[in-house]
Curated annotation (Swiss-Prot):
Names of required cofactors: K(+)
Function field: Exhibits a very high intrinsic GTPase hydrolysis rate. Involved in the addition of a carboxymethylaminomethyl (cmnm) group at the wobble position (U34) of certain tRNAs, forming tRNA-cmnm(5)s(2)U34.
Keywords: Cytoplasm, GTP-binding, Hydrolase, Magnesium, Metal-binding, Nucleotide-binding, Potassium, tRNA processing
Residues holding (6S)-5-formyl-5,6,7,8-tetrahydrofolate: R23, E82, K121, K444
Entry annotated with the keyword Magnesium: yes
Location relative to the cell: Cytoplasm
Cofactor note: Binds 1 potassium ion per subunit.
Tagged with keyword Coiled coil: no
Protein name: tRNA modification GTPase MnmE
Domain annotation TrmE-type G: ranges: 216-365
GO molecular function annotation: GTP binding; GTPase activity; metal ion binding
Family in the record: Belongs to the TRAFAC class TrmE-Era-EngA-EngB-Septin-like GTPase superfamily. TrmE GTPase family.
Organism phylogeny: Bacteria, Pseudomonadati, Chlamydiota, Chlamydiia, Chlamydiales
Transmembrane domains' residue ranges: none
Length: 444
């Protein structure tokens, strides 16, 4: 449902800054803005910028640069005016209040993006990518969101939809002319459904990798008690995140810290020291440590250079592992021939941490996105709907093999198209739209 009113909001985050932006969109955006600006906004051409003074009730608010983008050549598809004023809280707030006093309505979270979607400027997948771009915490999450916003995900979904529509058209012909001998034509919809299934499966298979790239690679620090795992976590992140004492078994639970290394996100996981114990609480912590090791993508096995070398757990041989010798400022570690990279550090002095960061960086850059157009799913909503599409296509393919009635096959394909419609936004409900855009910031 298209909106008829004019909305306004501050588009920049609160606080000190060189520039703040107030955005207005809607049928009366130009006339409302014109009433508070010293220049003649109504006479300005689209996509031009003009310097002037914002005045309301004969009071000068601020000098501002005004940008005009006329319908339909704007982000929302409506007339848009943006006021670029001095940063800080008061100038932009007073400009917004003036716009509201002249008839604009305060925008809801994500309402500008929602209008762009409703006016056909972007689809729902691209709209969701805007929030992902804003909230990206590392360079991979940014590239994934950028690819989605540029339409690469939408193109893949559109390909699936086109193949299903072609298959459905063949099936409807078969249903309309059952007396005709066109059995050989049944291979055509099977081919289209198979192609659609292949693309769908590729997208579904990208979900775990997309989640890892967007959320960060999980690296667990594990080892015997008092080896210095918590000290290493604190040293790497440069935070006093974990409690450090000389008492073995201080860490009883999993402690996770996000850390960005050269644009890549790591989830560093500190864990309880692994040993035999009768303490019930410590036992639970050790079990969680083992679970963290099994679920992590890499292990930093921390050893005390001054202590005897214990037997290594089997899981170290099954995952990317670095053998991290700590406390090398007070003891020399033994010479071992093991299939792991060995790094010698001191959490106390900082020795060896440059080499450790280089090794971790090498791990992280095994997947390079850069300007690649590869599509990764990261949204649970997208994954759920595509899984429904996959189920419907699989059922349709099975139905062909079992010679089910064409009406049953057509029903499966229509259900698949319905899920795709929910994905792209062509059939989405207002409740779903409200839930999606409510997560956006105001002014976007």
């Amino acid at each position: 449902m298209l909106q008829n009113d004019t909305i306004a909001a501050i588009a920049t985050p609160p606080g000190e800054g060189s520039v703040a932006i107030v955005r207005v969109s809607g049928p009366d955006a130009i006339s409302i803005s014109n009433r508070i600006f010293s220049g003649n906004i109504a006479g300005y051409a689209s996509h031009t910028a003009h310097l002037g003074t914002v005045v309301h009730n004969e009071v000068c608010i601020d000098q501002a640069l005004v940008l005009i983008m006329r319908t339909p050549r704007s982000f929302t598809g409506e007339d848009i005016v943006e006021f670029q004023c001095h940063g800080g809280y008061f100038a932009c707030s007073q400009i917004l209040n003036a716009l509201l006093a002249e008839g604009a309505r305060a925008a809801l979270p994500g309402e500008f993006s929602q209008r762009a979607f409703l006016n056909g400027k972007i689809d729902l997948i691209q709209a969701e990518a805007i929030q992902q771009l804003i909230s990206a915490e590392n360079i991979d999450a940014f590239h994934i969101a950028q690819n989605q916003f540029q339409g690469h995900t939408s193109q893949a979904i559109s390909s699936i939809s086109s193949l299903i529509i072609e298959a459905l058209a063949y099936i409807e012909v078969l249903a309309d002319f059952p007396e005709e001998d066109i059995e050989t034509e049944r291979s055509l919809p099977v081919q289209k459904i198979t192609e659609a299934l292949t693309i769908t499966q590729e997208l579904l298979s990208s979900f775990d990798e997309g989640q890892r790239l967007a959320q960060g690679t999980s690296i667990v620090l594990a080892g015997l008690p008092n080896a210095g795992k918590s000290s290493i976590l604190n040293a790497l992140t440069q935070k006093n995140r974990a409690i450090v004492t000389d008492i073995p078994g201080t860490t009883r639970d999993i402690l996770e810290e996000n850390w960005v290394l050269q644009g890549k996100n790591l989830r560093l996981i500190d864990s309880a020291g692994i040993r035999e114990t009768e303490n019930i609480v410590e036992k639970e912590g050790i079990e969680r440590a083992r679970q963290a090791m099994s679920q992590a993508e890499g292990i930093l096995w921390v050893m005390d250079a001054s202590q005897p070398v214990p037997e290594f757990p089997a899981i170290l041989y099954q995952k990317p592992t670095i053998l991290l010798w700590n406390k090398c400022d007070v003891a020399s570690p033994p010479q071992l021939e093991v299939p792991f990279q060995q790094i010698f550090v001191s959490a106390k002095t900082g020795k060896g941490f440059s080499e450790l960061r280089q090794a971790l960086n090498k791990w992280l850059h095994t997947t390079q996105l850069g300007k690649s157009s590869k599509v990764f799913l990261v949204s649970a909503r997208h994954h759920s709907l595509l899984h429904a599409v996959h189920t419907c296509l699989t059922d349709a393919l099975t139905g062909f093999q079992e010679h089910l009635p064409n009406e049953c096959l057509a029903l499966d394909l229509r259900q698949a198209l319905h899920s795709i419609g929910n994905l792209s936004g062509s059939e989405v409900t207002e409740n779903v739209l409200g839930e999606i855009f409510s997560k956006f910031c105001i002014g976007k």
